[in-house]
Amino acid sequence: MALEICVKAAVGAPDHLGDCPFSQRALLTLEEKSLTYKIHLINLSDKPQWFLDISPQGKVPVLKIDDKWVTDSDVIVGILEEKYPDPPLKTPAEFASVGSNIFGTFGTFLKSKDSNDGSEHALLVELEALENHLKSHDGPFIAGERVSAVDLSLAPKLYHLQVALGHFKSWSVPESFPHVHNYMKTLFSLDSFEKTKTEEKYVISGWAPKVNP
């Protein structure tokens, strides 16, 4: 029985994959495990009733597995790892939280209108921590030679960071973080990433209402 997954449709383009990094994380996991799945694009500004019936809070992603609909990307990734253990994607516990604060600090900086509020510095601190991890461990991924769950969580978030900050703030990751640059290049060149990424213009249209409410 094929798996089914509900993910965000693009803002203003409901027939295209949208800009939800948590949806892409789930799709990346499905792709890395070479699983067959059917995708449902959900227009989050006009949610169909059948979707609200399976996801009362109206959140994506939602995965149908064993005739049950499961919400939350953390839960989805855990279930897929348990049911389809090959190839293994579980990240060793000591590396599982690497980069976990990047997305939050990115969002704060992106929406900031005050250049002196410390939000840029907070993001740079997190990127420096990622740089130091990558520098002190054999890569190219967080946990070594093989891609794992932490990479699949970070990849969409770093893509959003690159696209949105480049567009709205003309900002990019400093060249003083060469390992982060190489890591992003490695992630973005994965076949699974190419297949599941949204177009840059939809990342921008997705963030626009949050940047300029």
UniProtKB/Swiss-Prot annotation:
Keyword Amino-acid biosynthesis: no
Active site: 20
Upregulating conditions: Induced by jasmonic acid (JA), oxidative chemical stresses (e.g. norflurazon, menadione, paraquat, and antimycin A), and during photosynthetic operation in the light. Also up-regulated by insects such as Pieris rapae in a JA-dependent manner.
Ranges for domain GST C-terminal: 84-213
GO cellular component term of the entry, any: chloroplast stroma
Membrane association type: Peripheral membrane protein
One Gene Ontology biological process: regulation of biological process involved in symbiotic interaction
Pfam family, one: GST_C_2
Annotated positions of the S-glutathionyl cysteine modification: 20
Family designation: Belongs to the GST superfamily. DHAR family.
Domain notes: May change from a globular, soluble state to a state where the N-terminal domain is inserted into the membrane and functions as ion channel. A conformation change of the N-terminal domain is thought to expose hydrophobic surfaces that trigger membrane insertion.
Full protein name: Glutathione S-transferase DHAR1, mitochondrial
Source organism: Arabidopsis thaliana (Mouse-ear cress)
